[in-house]
Amino acid sequence: METLDGVVVVGGGPVGLLTALKLGKAGIKVVVLEAEPGVSPSPRAVAYMPPTAAALDRFGLLQDIRKRAVMCPDFAYRHGNGELIAKMDWSVLSQDTQYPYMLLLGQNHVSNVIFQHLRELPNVEIRWNHRVEEVDQDDAYVTIETSSPGGTSRLRARWLAATDGARSTVRQKIGLTFDGITWDERLVATNVFYDFSLHGYSRANFVHDPVDWAVVVQLDKTGLWRVCYGEDASLSDAEVRRRLPERFKRLLPGAPTPDQYRVDHLNPYRVHQRCAAEFRRGRVVLAGDAAHATNPMGGLGLSGGVLDAEHLAEALIAVIKNGASTKTLDEYSIDRRKVFLEFTSPTATANFTWMKESDPAQRIRDDAMFKEAGTDRAVMRQFLLDLEKLNGRRVIEKKLKAA
């Protein structure tokens, strides 16, 4: 059996690769195990808030990511007919952060940037096509059994960072529950070539409608946009596809016909609000979607996952390199779980509820709230600065109080 005096990271998505990068830069030996043959080509998450941009800068990645990303100086709230409710301007935070903007880039491109940086670290190895089958641990090591095209193998390491997604095998194998709810609605993520800017759309838009609610964001610099909307969960994938021209005629500004846009990708999926009972059990520590899952309204899922990766790597470095107590990992677990339960999940839930609100009186109140935030820059600043809570213990309390 192979023994690693370091950390095994299970999951080769952006959260796992970021964790490996920070650990590797600290001189720790890391093996990343990923079931897929390479970086997933799916764009999936696309939005990165100011606290996340700051973290990416601390990882040494921001410059490379900015070269590929769409810079988003503002975002808009709209009615289903495209009418503007309010626009939020990130520049209102220019005195609070060096990163007064949102970045838009598919997580596959972010992962590829991280991967290129990892190739410079000889102490980090990525093993693609390695699927975790079993996890066991004792006081000194955690042992992972994997299957790959070459057969079954076993690897033991001092620590395991589980970043293997919402269906985490590691989380299941160590017996942690994943409590919460699955939303009734089925989300449909489509990537489409259509020029929303011709219709006055911002690069990021949240559409408020009881039926035709949606998120519309620019994915890259080629003219590709993400349109994410809701469908009845009882519909088959084929039925979702058949309904697409009808839905797009209502969802897209200008009521286009199919010959006026090109769909590059369509993915129906279910969304959840779930959280692991704890983020640490023995020598296994969870981060990202393996630890918590949220609906994508507001772009808080991967934004939080990036900060998980940074905090987890820092905790492991403190324990492994600096002789800190393993309670440091408990502190990580408690803090990041608190961030999700007290900020990320309630905020994403409120965003989702607002977008599909059907009560006319509540819709009027919601509109008034966002219009105030969109016209009063002091209110806008307070509204946007709240995202600093993604940082957990790093929240700049004096800024929040001064807002």
Curated annotation (Swiss-Prot):
**Any one of the GO BP annotations:** 3-(3-hydroxy)phenylpropionate catabolic process
Subunit structure, per the record?
A: Monomer.
**Pathway recorded for this protein:** Xenobiotic degradation; 4-nitrophenol degradation
Q: What is its EC number?
A: 1.14.13.167
Q: Where does FAD bind?
A: 6-35, 279-289
Pfam families, per database record: FAD_binding_3
Functionally, this protein is described as follows: Involved in the degradation of para-nitrophenol (4-NP). Catalyzes oxidation of 4-nitrophenol (4-NP) at position 4 with concomitant removal of the nitro group as nitrite and production of para-benzoquinone.
> Which family does the similarity line name?
Belongs to the PheA/TfdB FAD monooxygenase family.
Against InterPro entries, the record matches this protein to:
FAD-bd (IPR002938), FAD/NAD-bd_sf (IPR036188), PheA/TfdB_FAD_monoxygenase (IPR050631)
Q: Looking at the keywords, is ATP-binding present? A: no
Knockout phenotype, as recorded, reads: Cells lacking this gene are not able to grow on 4-NP.
The portions of this protein that span the membrane are none
Print the keywords alphabetically.
Aromatic hydrocarbons catabolism, FAD, Flavoprotein, Monooxygenase, NADP, Oxidoreductase
Q: Tell me the cofactors it needs.
A: FAD
In Swiss-Prot or TrEMBL terms, this protein is called: Para-nitrophenol 4-monooxygenase
